[in-house]
Amino acid sequence: LQELASVAPEYKLIPLKEHSNDVREAFRVEMKSFGGETISGLLYMPVAEGKYPAMISYMGYGSDVWYADPSSNPQMIEFMLCIRNQAFNRQPGEKDDWCARGISDKNTYYYRGAFADAVRAIDFVCSLDKTDTDRVFASGESQGGALTFAAASLDDRLKAIAPSAPFLCDYPDYFVLAGWPGDPIKAAAKEAGMSDEDMYKVLSYFDIKNFTDRIQCPVIMAIGLQDPVCPPHTNFAAYNHIKTEKSWICYPLSGHNVWQQEGWPVAKEDFFEKYL
């Protein structure tokens, strides 16, 4: 975090008129993050003067940006973060091997920078004149769920969070329960001449279960009981270390895309409403 703080963010807002109206304006945002990396995101900001709550959305692995109706959530600032190398930041033809990049050392592993990007998103949202910094929230699915947990663990400015199907939890068991991302990570570690012990040592610095006891805000989590990508066992490895007010919702027939379950958006909205 000290290294991140030493990097001037150099926020740049680029208007997206085709996605704006007289209710909210849309912007593509660019900023500098850990290591001087340029990252970006999509911002919707109310046109009317005032102070507004803000919602940060952390994206799933390899997801594309999706554009909202600017008239939806007229009383909310919304920011969708694109972490390094993904979405807006992905180069044409770039492989989606991020989970294995830099595995040979904790200082070079991809998620070191990505977790810092998650905190930089909070920096950005809190820098906006219209943000009520006492009402900043976050949510995300899969990789975005992991980033939501990481952000709240590393930064106490978040008021409440709602991750679903969180990724990157309990690696030793995770790699037994699911083939991906274990297979490409293990292959990269082998190529780097690492033992399993060395690999898991590096990964322990980025295991979400080792972060969540630092969370200071309320949490609601959604899981899919049939999830083969981020199995419930791994979700609860992170959840069980949370010491604050917390709750979870299980969708027994859902696989990985639990965030698409009909009841989750309503449950999430009701949860955040308590803290608005």
Predicted regions, residues:
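C-terminal catalytic histidine-bearing segment of alpha/beta-hydrolase fold enzymes
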Residues: 236-276
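Hydrolase active-site cap/lid region
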Residues: 149-194, 250
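Short alpha-helix in the alpha/beta-hydrolase fold that links the catalytic acid
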Residues: 217, 231-240
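Acidic catalytic loop of the alpha/beta-hydrolase fold
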Residues: 225-230, 257-258
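N-terminal cap/lid segment of alpha/beta-hydrolase-fold proteins
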Residues: 7-50
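Short beta-strand/loop motif that positions the catalytic acidic residue
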Residues: 214-215, 221-223, 227
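Cap/lid segment of the alpha/beta-hydrolase catalytic domain
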Residues: 66, 70-72, 76-116, 173-182
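Gly/Ser-rich "nucleophile elbow"/oxyanion-hole loop immediately N-terminal to the catalytic nucleophile
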Residues: 100-142
